[in-house]
Design a protein with these regions (language model features):
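N-terminal regions of ATP-driven nucleic-acid and macromolecular assemblies
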Residues: 1-164
């Protein structure tokens, strides 16, 4: 992983089993793609998280199609994280952009992680934006409580452009 490694403690807090995690580090994107294909061919793999920096030439439409077919054949969910890359054609079923959001911290803890997720591509349609909060106790995402919201003004539109 270019941006660090999965933290066993963090994975445990999110409801995962750190002992079930296998991390593979490669020297370059081509080796990472080869390792991903090997992993997708293994039985008993729950998911694959492949992280690639930028837009390497080896990750073209053909390579993404091969990954997609291997994942479909094995039944393994494959995630491709691309840091510092522009959107480009791929064989992915979906494309998401995920950003962090402020969590609702309480006096006794940091609060659970909250994300803004945008589904930017889906072969079957149905694009949209979602706010989601991770609930580690139930190991699922929930709609975050955004707290108090100011009522819209009755005498004017809620959003008003102001000339400066």
């Amino acid at each position: 992983m270019e941006y660090g490694a999965c933290s066993p403690n963090g994975l445990l807090e999110l409801g995962g089993d750190p002992q079930a995690l296998i991390q593979v580090r490669t020297r370059n994107a081509a080796d990472a793609l080869a390792a991903a294909h090997d992993i997708l061919a293994c039985p008993h793999v729950g998911a694959l998280l492949l992280e690639i920096e930028g837009m390497p030439k080896c990750l073209d439409l053909v390579a993404s199609r091969r990954l997609s077919l291997a994942a479909a054949e094995s039944g393994v969910t494959a995630f491709l994280l691309r840091h510092g890359a522009q959107a480009q054609p791929s064989a992915a079923l979906t494309r998401w952009q995920v950003d962090s959001m402020p969590s609702q911290a309480k006096d006794d803890d940091w609060g659970n992680p909250v994300f803004a997720a945008q589904l930017t591509r889906h072969r079957a349609g149905g694009l949209g934006s979602f706010s989601m909060k991770w609930n580690p106790a139930n190991a699922c995402f929930e709609t975050p409580d955004i707290g108090a919201v100011v009522a819209a003004p009755a005498d004017r539109p809620a959003h008003q452009k102001i000339a400066i």
